[in-house]
């Protein structure tokens, strides 16, 4: 369970089943615990079918829990319908009324609640200014680009300042450049509003860029909750290590521990070295090494570094960096990202060349589990 100060949302032991067309029960949420702080940007991340959208829909009220508790601002919400929850949702499809002006789209909820005309005009204008759409109240949705329509959908969702904003893959239909711009705008908007955002995405870059905390789900279970850097650098298990970012996940077993350094032998054919804190001789592990943590030359004291040997299979230019695929003597594949390589260094990256890759001992992250 994650613990947030001053939680706006608390989910306790949430369970949700679905029935397949064949009549089989599928557990979409399996005992999920989560809390979201009042000013947090929390992202639900995981593969298709992991439960992230189901979890979002239970918070919004579009799905009900089979068991467990849901509290928003300390009030039990299990029996409260969606329209009575202090929550708004922004979807991938903008769901704007095409026959209404932008101002009327944004102010629709205020009209339903009977807000006075002068106050409505002020709040609609303020919401549109916040999303960079001020002065466009009289336009119709069909006159706007996709990015502008997304901003209008956001303005509509925040016009009455909900306690919580839910975002269900709202940027996935935008092109890459616009999506990156909207990521920055969303994060700035969340800070300015001072309300909690719960964001669903399948895009890891979005999650790592925007979130205060990330919730990684798989098979209806929470695998890990943490800050983006913790999730990336210190994954809790092999699933998170393999799912988040590019990774080399090497199976190994601790052979010896001496002078604060553990030596492991694994399927990659070379001895692996890493700090021995918390490790025991004979212990099976997965060792995580990110591709960008390798160096062509030892950058410091060799005693503080480990090395992997292999033969270059492929080198691919990816902008200013080179992605190198290495195969060890035992057949294991290692992926490395080489940065700022000199012309002389590039000669060592030709396919068929023998290559030694260096890494700092503390860059290797051990993960408990059968090797």
Ranges and model annotations:
Residues 247, 257-371:
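Non-catalytic connector elements of ABC transporters
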Residues 45-47:
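The feature captures the beta-strand-to-loop junction immediately N-terminal to the Walker
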Residues 68-76:
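Conserved ABC transporter NBD signature motif
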Residues 32-43, 97:
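Pre-Walker A (P-loop) beta-loop-beta motif of ABC nucleotide-binding domains
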Residues 60:
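Helix-to-loop junction immediately C-terminal to a conserved catalytic motif
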Residues 82-242:
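ABC ATPase nucleotide-binding domains
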